[in-house]
C-alpha cells in the first residue's frame, strides 16, 4: 500500500482542508492517507478550539485513514522544529510522499529554494543576523535575507510557503526517502479574516466568527456537516470552545508568582523579555490586551503566544534541547484502510506504535504532553476537568467505520 503523509492542525477542519485531501489523493494515488496532527496546543501558540479527539473525528469523517499526534515539544514551535518532528514521524510510519498546501503551489520552487539554502547557508545565516540586528522580527529577517540571497526566490512572507520550505529542508537534512509534493491553497489565505469566497474561508476567520458570535450557523457554508456536528457536540458536552482568554487568569497567576529567574528557564524566554512580561501583566485584563502591550518588532504576537503556552506548561529550555526527535508514534484514530496498513507495516516501524497513552508514562516527551493536557483541560470546571484528564490517558484510538463525506 502506498502511504502519503499530510501535516495538519484542523482548527477546525473546513472546506479548504477537504479540497487539500481530495487533491492529495488525486495527485499522489495514495492507498493510505496519514495525518500527523498537533495535539491540544498548536504551532502558533494557540489552544485548539476543540480537543485532539474531536478533531481526529473530523479528519476520519473526511477520509483521512490514520491520524497520529505530533508531540507538544514539536507542535508548539517555530517552523523548523515543527517540520522536523512531523516529517520524522511520517517517515517512521513508512510514508513515501508528503503533500502540503502552499501559496506557491509549485514543488520545483521549493526544491530549488532548498538547494540554494544548502549551498549558501552561511551567507543566509549572516544576512538573517544582520536583519535581526536592525530590529526585524525573525520571520521578517528570514524573508528579507532570502530575498537578498535569491531575487527569484520562493515568497517566504507567506505562512504556508514558510512551512512547506521547512518540510522540504527537514526531509533533506534528515536524509529521508519521502518525496515532497505541493498543491496551491484555494481562495482564502492563512491569516485572511474575511469571507470573500462562497464556500472557502480560513480557519482564522472561522474561529473569529465563533469567538464573537458563538453561532455555528454563521460558518455552516464553510465547513463539512461532520465538523459542525463535532463542534456542536463538544460545546454541549464541555460548555465551551477553547480560546486564549479561557487561560488568561492561569497565565496571569503564573507570571505574577514566577521570578525573572524562573521565567528565564522557560523555552523561548530570551533577550530580557521576562522583565517586560512581568511589567505588562500587572495591569492587563485580557490576553489580547496583554499581548498587544507586550509585543515588539522582535517579539511578534505568534512568538509571544508560543512563549506563553510554554509558561503555562512549564516547558523549559533544557527540555527543549533534549527533544532531539520523536520517540514514539501515538495513534489517535484510524479507519479500516488505516487498520490494514498498520497491520501490514507494524513489524517494520522505526518507532513503537502506541495505542494507550498509559504505556508512555516516564517518556520525557509524553511527560510534557501530560502537562499540556492538564493546562488545556483546566478550562473546564469539575467534574468535567477530571473527566477530560482521564480521556487523555484512557481513550483508545478512535475507529471510524462510517461513510466518507460525499
UniProtKB/Swiss-Prot annotation:
EC nos = 6.3.4.-
GO CC terms for this protein? cytoplasm
Its recorded reaction(s) are: cytidine(34) in elongator tRNA(Met) + acetate + ATP = N(4)-acetylcytidine(34) in elongator tRNA(Met) + AMP + diphosphate
**Can you tell which superkingdom this protein's organism belongs to?**
Bacteria
Any one of the GO BP annotations: tRNA modification
Report residues binding ATP.
7-20, 101, 160, 185
Q: What InterPro entries would the database entry show? A: Rossmann-like_a/b/a_fold (IPR014729), tRNA(Met)_cyd_acetate_ligase (IPR008513)
Q: Which UniProt keywords apply?
A: ATP-binding, Cytoplasm, Ligase, Nucleotide-binding, RNA-binding, tRNA processing, tRNA-binding
The places in or outside the cell where this protein is found are:
Cytoplasm
The record's annotation in Pfam families points to: HIGH_NTase1
Q: What parts of the sequence cross the membrane?
A: none
Alphabetized PANTHER family for the sequence? TRNA(MET) CYTIDINE ACETATE LIGASE
Q: Which family does it belong to?
A: Belongs to the TmcAL family.
Q: What does this protein do?
A: Catalyzes the formation of N(4)-acetylcytidine (ac(4)C) at the wobble position of elongator tRNA(Met), using acetate and ATP as substrates. First activates an acetate ion to form acetyladenylate (Ac-AMP) and then transfers the acetyl group to tRNA to form ac(4)C34.
Q: What is the recorded name of this protein?
A: tRNA(Met) cytidine acetate ligase
Amino acid at each position: 500500500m502506498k502511504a502519503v503523509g499530510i501535516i495538519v492542525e484542523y482548527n477546525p477542519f473546513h472546506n479548504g482542508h477537504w479540497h487539500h485531501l481530495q487533491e492529495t489523493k488525486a495527485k499522489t494515488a495514495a492507498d493510505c492517507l496519514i495525518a500527523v496532527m498537533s495535539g491540544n496546543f498548536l504551532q502558533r501558540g494557540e489552544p485548539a478550539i476543540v480537543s485532539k479527539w474531536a478533531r481526529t473525528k473530523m479528519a476520519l469523517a473526511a477520509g483521512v485513514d490514520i491520524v497520529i499526534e505530533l508531540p507538544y515539544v514539536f507542535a508548539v514551535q517555530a517552523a523548523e522544529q515543527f517540520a522536523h518532528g512531523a516529517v520524522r514521524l511520517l517517515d517512521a510510519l513508512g510514508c513515501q510522499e508528503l503533500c502540503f498546501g502552499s501559496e506557491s503551489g509549485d514543488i520545483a520552487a521549493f526544491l530549488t529554494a532548498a538547494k540554494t539554502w544548502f549551498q549558501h547557508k552561511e551567507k543566509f545565516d549572516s544576512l538573517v543576523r544582520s536583519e535581526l540586528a536592525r530590529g526585524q522580527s525573525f520571520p521578517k529577517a528570514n524573508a528579507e535575507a532570502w530575498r537578498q540571497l535569491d531575487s527569484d526566490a520562493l515568497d517566504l512572507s507567506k505562512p504556508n510557503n514558510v512551512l512547506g520550505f521547512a518540510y522540504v529542508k527537514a526531509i533533506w537534512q534528515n536524509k529521508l526517502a519521502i518525496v515532497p509534493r505541493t498543491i496551491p491553497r484555494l481562495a482564502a489565505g492563512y491569516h485572511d479574516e474575511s469571507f470573500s469566497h462562497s464556500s472557502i474561508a480560513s480557519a482564522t476567520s472561522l474561529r473569529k466568527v465563533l469567538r464573537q458570535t458563538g453561532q455555528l450557523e454563521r460558518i455552516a457554508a464553510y465547513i463539512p456537516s461532520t465538523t459542525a456536528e463535532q463542534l456542536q457536540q463538544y460545546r454541549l458536552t464541555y460548555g465551551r470552545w477553547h480560546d486564549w482568554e479561557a487561560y488568561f487568569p492561569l497565565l496571569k497567576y503564573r507570571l505574577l508568582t514566577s521570578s525573572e529567574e524562573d521565567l528565564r528557564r522557560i523555552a523561548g524566554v530570551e533577550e530580557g523579555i521576562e522583565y517586560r512580561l512581568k511589567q505588562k501583566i500587572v495591569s492587563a485584563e485580557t490576553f489580547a490586551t496583554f499581548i498587544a502591550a507586550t509585543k515588539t518588532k522582535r517579539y511578534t504576537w505568534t512568538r509571544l503566544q508560543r512563549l506563553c503556552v510554554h509558561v503555562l506548561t512549564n516547558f523549559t529550555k533544557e527540555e527543549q534541547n533534549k527533544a532531539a526527535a520523536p520517540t514514539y508514534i501515538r495513534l489517535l484514530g484510524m479507519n479500516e484502510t488505516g487498520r490494514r496498513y498498520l497491520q501490514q507495516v507494524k513489524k517494520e516501524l522505526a518507532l513503537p506504535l502506541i495505542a494507550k497513552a498509559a504505556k508512555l508514562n516516564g517518556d520525557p516527551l509524553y511527560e510534557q504532553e501530560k502537562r499540556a493536557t492538564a493546562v488545556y483541560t483546566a478550562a473546564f470546571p469539575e467534574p468535567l476537568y477530571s473527566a477530560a484528564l482521564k480521556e487523555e490517558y484512557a481513550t483508545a484510538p478512535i475507529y471510524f467505520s462510517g461513510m466518507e463525506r460525499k
